[in-house]
């Protein structure tokens, strides 16, 4: 994957979805139409954070390279150089996957 030349604004985060595997335990192949939307993603780029009421920048908690759980229907899907990414607000990130 070539890193896209894009910088999210404000409290937005650019992520690359981690597609679930096509074959599950037991060798069952899942057709594309039956797959659920992936909820795991890798953080590609982060914005500078949002401003509070005093104009002070609140930094984003995730960083580039973090593996995260995201809201199932949050964000906006974008294609950059033929690859699919998602831009979402920090609030659409549910958790950081550690380990």
UniProtKB/Swiss-Prot annotation:
UniProt cross-references to Pfam families, sorted A to Z: Cpn10
Primary localisation category: cytoplasm
Keyword Cytoplasm on entry: yes
CDD domains assigned to the protein according to its UniProt record, in alphabetical order: cpn10 (cd00320)
Keywords associated with the record: Chaperone, Cytoplasm
A Gene Ontology molecular function term of the record: ATP binding
Record PROSITE patterns: CHAPERONINS_CPN10
Species of provenance: Methylacidiphilum infernorum (isolate V4)
Protein name: Co-chaperonin GroES
A GO CC annotation given for this chain: cytoplasm
Entry annotated with the keyword DNA-binding: no
Assembly behavior: Heptamer of 7 subunits arranged in a ring. Interacts with the chaperonin GroEL.
Annotated family: Belongs to the GroES chaperonin family.
Function: Together with the chaperonin GroEL, plays an essential role in assisting protein folding. The GroEL-GroES system forms a nano-cage that allows encapsulation of the non-native substrate proteins and provides a physical environment optimized to promote and accelerate protein folding. GroES binds to the apical surface of the GroEL ring, thereby capping the opening of the GroEL channel.
GO process annotations (BP): chaperone cofactor-dependent protein refolding
InterPro entries in alphabetical order: Chaperonin_GroES, Chaperonin_GroES_sf, Chaprnonin_Cpn10_CS, GroES-like_sf
Subcellular location per the Swiss-Prot or TrEMBL entry: Cytoplasm
């Amino acid at each position: 994957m070539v890193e896209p030349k894009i910088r999210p604004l404000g409290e937005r985060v650019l992520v690359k979805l981690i597609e679930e595997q096509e074959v599950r335990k037991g060798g069952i192949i899942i057709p594309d139409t039956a797959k659920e939307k992936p909820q795991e993603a890798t953080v590609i780029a982060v914005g500078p954070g949002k401003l509070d009421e005093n104009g002070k920048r609140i930094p984003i908690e995730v960083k580039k390279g973090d593996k995260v759980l995201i809201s199932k229907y949050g964000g906006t899907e974008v294609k950059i150089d033929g690859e699919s990414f998602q831009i979402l607000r920090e609030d659409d990130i549910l958790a950081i996957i550690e380990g």
